[in-house]
């Protein structure tokens, strides 16, 4: 297994697909990396030489924020919004949808499991 950006990428998959196992690299970015380095996209990871794996590793380290750094950056952005006490920060703090979705009904993923309230007694 090749280890790139702290992730063991699967050896039996195509290079483009295998790179998407790294957090922060999607299909488009993987395709850009492969074409930039001149690696055939249909090649499998197990067929890559050590030099090619090193080239991929260096390209990712130089040009992209991935894995732990990306997760930390996203968490810091959310924390910054919460510290500013802006509308989006308050929504994050309360655990409600941030991007204007309705909350009268729905939003269960963000709000969590419904809390039962006493029903109407007959």
Curated annotation (Swiss-Prot):
One of its GO terms (biological process) is translation. Residues 95-122 are annotated as: Disordered. It comes from the Bacteria. GO terms for cellular component: cytosol; small ribosomal subunit. Disulfide bonds: none annotated. GO terms for molecular function: rRNA binding; structural constituent of ribosome; tRNA binding. Keywords: Ribonucleoprotein, Ribosomal protein, RNA-binding, rRNA-binding, tRNA-binding. InterPro entries: Rbsml_uS13_C, Ribosomal_uS13, Ribosomal_uS13-like_H2TH, Ribosomal_uS13_bac-type, Ribosomal_uS13_CS. HAMAP family: Ribosomal_uS13 (MF_01315). Located at the top of the head of the 30S subunit, it contacts several helices of the 16S rRNA. In the 70S ribosome it contacts the 23S rRNA (bridge B1a) and protein L5 of the 50S subunit (bridge B1b), connecting the 2 subunits; these bridges are implicated in subunit movement. Contacts the tRNAs in the A and P-sites. Belongs to the universal ribosomal protein uS13 family. Part of the 30S ribosomal subunit. Forms a loose heterodimer with protein S19. Forms two bridges to the 50S subunit in the 70S ribosome. This is Small ribosomal subunit protein uS13. It comes from Zymomonas mobilis subsp. mobilis (strain ATCC 31821 / ZM4 / CP4). The lineage of its organism: Bacteria, Pseudomonadati, Pseudomonadota, Alphaproteobacteria, Sphingomonadales.
């Amino acid at each position: 297994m090749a280890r790139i950006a702290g992730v063991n990428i699967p050896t039996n998959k195509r290079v483009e697909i295998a790179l998407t196992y790294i957090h922060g690299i999607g299909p488009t970015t993987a395709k850009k990396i492969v074409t930039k380095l001149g690696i055939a996209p249909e090649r499998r990871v197990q067929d890559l030489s050590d030099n090619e794996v090193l080239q991929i590793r260096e390209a990712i380290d130089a040009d992209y924020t991935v894995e732990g750094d990306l997760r930390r950056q996203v968490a810091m952005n959310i924390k910054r919004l919460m510290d500013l006490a802006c509308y989006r920060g308050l929504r994050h703090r309360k655990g409600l949808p941030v991007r204007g979705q309705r909350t009268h009904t729905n939003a269960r993923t963000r709000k969590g499991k419904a809390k039962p309230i006493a029903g109407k007694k007959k």
